[in-house]
Amino acid sequence: AYMAFPLPGTPQLIAPSNVGPYYAKAAPRAATVEELHVIVRQFGEAAHRFQQAGGDGVEIQCAHAHGLLGGFLTPLYNKRADEYGGDINGRLRLTLEVIEEVRKMCGEDFIIDVRISGDEYSDGGLTLNDMIYVSKQLEKAGVDFIHVSGGNTIKRGSSMPAPGTAPAPHAHSSE
């Protein structure tokens, strides 16, 4: 799920907003800014534990409106009016803070890969142009790789062409 339990004993799932996916049994509540600070630290600590265990790097999942970071990035789930919502820069803020924390905890030689959807293929979702901008911001933040896929978990099959679709319907994404 794109939602998370930020702290042990948290009774309700949190998300960017109180908007949940179609498969959620109950609506989440919007994460507080204080919880987001804890989550950023937890990402850094988890990456550091992996590094201490011999790992060379991590992939941070922001694709498919899946996972907490993917939920924050998409306008389909993120309805916040604070610094973690609104325009693309606000919605990207949490991911950039996570990248910064991982770098701080693990150093410059630790590999950071970020997975994004190149296009969510959903009305009102992230577009190719949005994700070109996001990719440039991730590069500025010092990520080593950007893993691009497509679609989202909101509209099942959003990245799968309908039967009878002309060949290579997503070829425009490679230009």
Language-model features, listed with the residues they occupy:
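Flavin-dependent oxidoreductase catalytic cores
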Residues: A1-E175
